Amino acid sequence: MGTDVWVGSWRPHRPRGPIAALYSSPGPKYSLPGNTGFVSHDPSRYRAPAYSMGNRRFKFVDDCSPGPGYLVPSNITVKGKDGTPAYSIYGRPKDISSFRTPGPGSYSPERAGKSAYRSAPTYSLGERTKTFSNDQTPGPAAYVLPSVIGPRIVNRISAPNYSMTGRSKIGSFHEDLQRTPGPGTYRVIDPGSYKHRPPQYSMTARNVLPGDTTIKPGPGAYSPEKVVMSRPQAPNFSFGIRHSDYVAPLIVDVAD
């Protein structure tokens, strides 16, 4: 060891942890499942039962027992009443009143004239009853008598009648107008193909002969008063522009 030469400050020492390059097997790279607890327990090992403590369940009422609010009678057993006779004391009923026979003063024979003797009818106006609005008595308009006109009479002879219904648009001429052929629908064959054909004539447009189509001037196109070449005319003078004194004259022939 004393003769070894080391470069730098590095010296051989014990590693602090396992080095994967020193093992041919997976080694500590894979962790085995534990044998404690309930989650991720080793399936090849025996596991004891695990228990958990849940929350207290909700109660609808604070007191579930009947308590002293219920007074159970002494004659009530587990199967119901014991069947002993029970008696109660009621009040005294009222005495039945005796029948009172009416005397002579209880009758009014003077009021029996209309019922015992013949009398003229009398009428009175009473007030409207409360059930008048709910009266369901049918009136004359509630009845419908059978008609004596028409074919629906059983005991009457009626002439035949007819009715006109509307035309349906499905499968009718309203749906397809081609189903109603008009005069233009048929193709009429020319009668000249199977009969003697008379001579036929046609009218063409008028033919115009070729000629000079230039516009010829009329009498109004000329101005004879402006012609001065065929008559003597006095001399005419006009005013020209003033030339500048500083303009050089035009010299055409230059002397050598």
Swiss-Prot record:
STPGR repeat residues: 66-92, 181-206, 217-242
Predominant place of localization: cytoplasm
Signal peptide feature range: none
The keyword Cytoplasm appears for this protein: yes
Top-level taxonomic group: Eukaryota
GO cellular component, one term: cytoplasm
Task of the protein: Outer dense fibers are filamentous structures located on the outside of the axoneme in the midpiece and principal piece of the mammalian sperm tail. May help to maintain the passive elastic structures and elastic recoil of the sperm tail.
Protein name: Ciliary microtubule associated protein 1A
Underlying gene: cimap1a
